[in-house]
UniProtKB/Swiss-Prot annotation:
It comes from Bremia lactucae (Lettuce downy mildew). The keyword Transcription does not apply. This is RxLR effector protein BLN06. GO terms for cellular component: extracellular region; host cell plasma membrane; membrane. Secreted effector that triggers a robust hypersensitive response (HR) in Lactuca serriola LS102. The response to BLN06 was visible as chlorosis but not as strong necrosis. The keyword Hydrolase does not apply. Residues 1-20 form the signal peptide. A motif (dEER) lies at residues 50-53. The gene is BLN06. Glycans are attached at residue 38. Keywords: Glycoprotein, Host cell membrane, Host membrane, Membrane, Secreted, Signal.
């Protein structure tokens, strides 16, 4: 055996002996397992049967996250009523520094530092509820605003989302059950530092505010009934506001919406409010005063073609059509009065106009409410009413399914001297007839031919409205000629009746 072989054998022997001594010494130095003899939270009991029935408690979930035990180890310990105490750690005297509040944009709860801090804190407060003591200490050290910003970051990570939810709900419960610490949702708005001039941050923090509002309401005004969601808008609304989605006045105040100026359109939560309105109106078919104000604001914006607002009437009208609402329902929702002489100038009328057009496409027939609306417009000679009449005429002409016979049916029109003089809707019919004839240069058989024949007859010679109708048609053909027999006959009769020269 060479000298080298002897040397290697000696080194191996010494190494194995030292390792055995180390292992023996290390095991002897370990503390004995801590048995749950006093049922304290320092030694957390684990009842597998109870957890199987009820699911993991929030305390269990929080402790499992802090201890970060592998899944296999949890299975092995599932039938035991003991847990091994975590290794003793040096008490951290400056937990605020440990939480690094100067870097709250990071997910602090995911860090190993936070876990060590939480373990140390629980060791010092073994007789208290784990999530309560952690929540309280974080609130004290971070202060409320930073505390919730930390939880907001943690909620974005699937690994810490559940822990963030536990801590958030724990603080909500403390505020709602400890009288001297109670704060209202309006005060919590300020805690979250919601700023209308910072829309991204506002919308990111708004769900936290709404969760507290729901929690606060559940404690002080418990309710269980919720709407049955019909679409994604309903689902989002119910998710945001819970069973309290009908508390629209309170919600508007909580969001700090301004309905008296165009600043409404710059509010980050404007669409949240509009979605709430859609769900609310589908259910109640009656608008609250703040909703009527909203329609007026949106109507003004649509009239001005302001960016992102011109489509609001379309969105609401389509939803009302899908909900099978009738014209009278929409009139009520918009807070309109079809007998009001200022109906055309009401800014919310733009919503009604869009709805009527979509409604008539699906129901091209007379509707009592629609006929009354056209009659009101026909009797109004204001600039706004004339513009609306012109717009409706254009709509009828560009929509193929609206033949002259269909339009006449929608107006519930009768061609007679008595009807013409007493029904203002005749004015809109004549505007339609005039544009149709000038555009097409022919007069087809049916309502248009009957109208020209009536106007050219002596039976209607003395009517005031009849004279205005003749003048309207005749002036449109000034300097023009037509090869259509009916049109030529009318123009000849019109000149004779009114002593006009062709």
């Amino acid at each position: 055996m060479t000298l080298l072989h002897c040397w290697l054998l000696l080194v191996g022997h010494l190494a194995s002996t030292a390792y055995a001594d180390f292992i023996t010494k290390d095991f002897k130095s370990l503390p004995p397992p801590a048995y749950d003899t006093n049922a304290t939270q320092a030694l957390v009991p684990y009842n597998a049967a109870l957890e199987e029935r009820n699911g993991p408690s929030s305390s269990t979930a929080l402790l499992q996250y802090i201890d970060h035990k592998p899944g296999l180890m949890k299975k092995l310990l599932a039938g035991l009523s003991i847990r091994f105490a975590p290794p003793t750690m040096k008490v951290i005297s400056t937990p605020t520094d440990m939480l690094r509040i100067d870097k709250i944009k990071n997910n602090i709860i995911k860090s190993s530092q936070w876990k060590r801090w939480a373990r140390s804190l629980l060791e010092q407060n073994s007789m208290q509820n784990s999530h309560v003591i952690i929540t309280k200490k974080m609130m004290d050290d971070l202060k409320p605003t930073n505390f919730f910003l930390v939880l907001l970051e943690a909620s974005k990570d699937k690994n810490t989302k559940a822990v963030a939810k536990i801590l958030e709900e724990t603080q909500f419960a403390r505020w709602c059950t400890i009288e001297h610490e109670s704060i209202s949702p309006m005060e919590f708005y300020d805690v979250l530092q919601l700023n209308l001039n910072e829309p991204i941050a506002y919308m990111e923090r708004l769900p936290v505010l709404l969760r507290y509002w729901k929690y606060y309401k559940s404690v002080h005004s418990p309710m269980s009934s919720v709407a049955t969601p019909k679409d994604i808008i309903d689902k989002q609304t119910v998710n945001r506001f819970g069973p309290y989605w009908k508390h629209t006045g309170e919600i508007a105040e909580l969001l700090r919406l301004d309905f008296d100026s165009d600043s409404f359109f710059n509010h980050p939560a404007r669409n949240v409010w509009l979605d709430l309105m859609k769900t609310y109106l589908d259910d109640t078919k009656t608008a609250e005063p703040l909703m009527i104000k909203t329609f007026q604001l949106l109507g003004n914006a649509a009239a001005k073609n302001l960016q992102n607002n011109v489509y609001s009437p379309i969105h609401f009208a389509e939803r009302w059509i899908q909900a099978n609402l009738q014209p009278i329902d929409v009139v009520t929702i918009l807070g309109l009065d079809i007998h009001d002489s200022n109906l055309a100038t009401n800014s919310a009328f733009s919503f009604l106009k869009v709805f009527i057009e979509k409604f008539l496409v699906n129901h091209p027939e007379a509707d009592t409410t629609v006929v009354k609306i056209f009659s009101r417009l026909g009797s109004d000679e204001s600039e706004k009413a004339l513009a609306l009449r012109k717009s409706f005429v254009s709509f009828f002409l560009r929509t193929p399914k609206f033949t002259p016979k269909t339009v006449m049916s929608i107006f519930d029109l009768t061609i007679s001297a008595d009807y013409v003089e007493k029904n203002p809707v005749w004015a809109i019919w004549m505007e339609y007839v005039n544009v149709y004839l000038v555009k097409n240069k022919v007069c087809p058989e049916g309502p248009l031919a009957d109208t020209l024949e009536f106007l050219g007859s002596t039976a209607a010679a003395d009517g005031v409205v009849r004279k205005k109708s003749i003048e309207l048609l005749y002036s449109s053909w000034s300097g023009k000629t037509s090869q259509d027999t009916r049109i030529k006959q009318f123009l000849t009769a019109a000149a004779r009746l009114n002593q006009l020269e062709l």
